[in-house]
C-alpha cells in the first residue's frame, strides 16, 4: 500500500503499531494475531505513535498540511479514531474498520462514540457480507455523522465481505479492491492531498 501511494507522489509511512506488544511475523493465522497482539494495543498508544509518525514525516520533507490516513480492518477503526484525534488531518479512508464495540481500558471509545470529535472527512469502504461489521452499524454511523454535520461518504459493496482488499487472503475481491483504491485516490485528491 505504501509503495502504491508513493507511486502517486505521496510520502507514505506504515508505522509498526504493534512493536511493543509483539511481532506478528511468527504467528500463522489472523485470529491468533488479533488475540495475542492486537488486543493488547491501547488506542492512546496508537494515537501517540501516529502523531509521532506525522511529526517525523513533517521533519523529513512531508507536508504536514496534507496529512491523511488510511487503514484496513483494525487500521480502519484507527482511521476513524485518528480523524477525531488529529486536528488538521485532511482526509481519511477507512477500509472495513469496526465502528462499534464494548469500551475497555485499552479501547475506551469506538468510532460511533467519537462522531462529534471527527474533524476530517472520511470515506468508509465496507462489504455487505462482512460477518463482523453489520451493514446496520454502517447505517448507524452514516446517520450519526449526518446528524452531526460531518463530511463522510460510505460505499458498501454488495458482494464483498471483510478484507476484500487483502490480495493474499481468500476474501480478496479484485473488482471491489480496485474500485476502492480508485475511490481512495479520488477522495485524497478531492480533499487537497
How would you describe each model-predicted region?
Residues 1-193:
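N-terminal cap/leader regions of alpha/beta-hydrolase-fold enzymes
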Amino acid at each position: 500500500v505504501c509503495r502504491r501511494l508513493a507511486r502517486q507522489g505521496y510520502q507514505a509511512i506504515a508505522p509498526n503499531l504493534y512493536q511493543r506488544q509483539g511481532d506478528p511475523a511468527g504467528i500463522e493465522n489472523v485470529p491468533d494475531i488479533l488475540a495475542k497482539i492486537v488486543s493488547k494495543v491501547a488506542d492512546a498508544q496508537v494515537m501517540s505513535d501516529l502523531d509521532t509518525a506525522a511529526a517525523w514525516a513533517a521533519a523529513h520533507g512531508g507536508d504536514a498540511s496534507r496529512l491523511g490516513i488510511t487503514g484496513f480492518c483494525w487500521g480502519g477503526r484507527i482511521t476513524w479514531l485518528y480523524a477525531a484525534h488529529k486536528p488538521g488531518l485532511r482526509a481519511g479512508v477507512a477500509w472495513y474498520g469496526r465502528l462499534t464495540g464494548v469500551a475497555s481500558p485499552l479501547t475506551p471509545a469506538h468510532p460511533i462514540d467519537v462522531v462529534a470529535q471527527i474533524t476530517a472527512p472520511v470515506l468508509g469502504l465496507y462489504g455487505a457480507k462482512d460477518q463482523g461489521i453489520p451493514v446496520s452499524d454502517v447505517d448507524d454511523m452514516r446517520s450519526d455523522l449526518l446528524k452531526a454535520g460531518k463530511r463522510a461518504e460510505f460505499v458498501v459493496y454488495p458482494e464483498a465481505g471483510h478484507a476484500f482488499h487483502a490480495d493474499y487472503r481468500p476474501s480478496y475481491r479484485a473488482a471491489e479492491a480496485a474500485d476502492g483504491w480508485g475511490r481512495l485516490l479520488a477522495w485524497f485528491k478531492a480533499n487537497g492531498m
